[in-house]
């Protein structure tokens, strides 16, 4: 299992555009073989800062998403229009996954 953590701070004037793109991409990511889930939360201590946490079966699934056309085009738009004041992406393999039975 692979977790992708996308921390970001959208430009306040372009935040609506980011969320429009994210809504469209949600429909696309759900079609990717190996996609498990995605959650997005806003920071309590830093309003306007968000974390998107996606879960994947394996790295091959993450790569399929990274190469998906709509996703690539959205990334290009985000870079060219400077939708984000700041962002960081972390990709991690899950060593353990457990909870109550």
Predicted regions and their residues:
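Conserved short loop/helix modules at catalytic or binding sites
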Residues: 74
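Short S/T/G/P-rich N-terminal loop/turn motif that feeds into the first structured element of a domain
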Residues: 1-50, 57-67, 77, 82-101
């Amino acid at each position: 299992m692979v977790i992708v953590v996308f921390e970001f701070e959208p430009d306040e004037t372009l935040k609506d555009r980011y969320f429009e793109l994210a809504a469209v991409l949600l429909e696309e990511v759900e079609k990717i073989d190996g996609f498990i889930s995605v959650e997005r939360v806003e920071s309590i201590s830093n309003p306007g800062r968000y974390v998107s946490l996606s879960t994947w079966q394996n790295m091959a699934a993450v790569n399929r998403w990274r190469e998906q056309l709509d996703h690539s085009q959205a990334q290009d738009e985000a870079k060219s229009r400077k939708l984000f004041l700041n962002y960081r992406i972390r990709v991690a393999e899950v060593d353990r996954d457990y909870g109550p039975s």
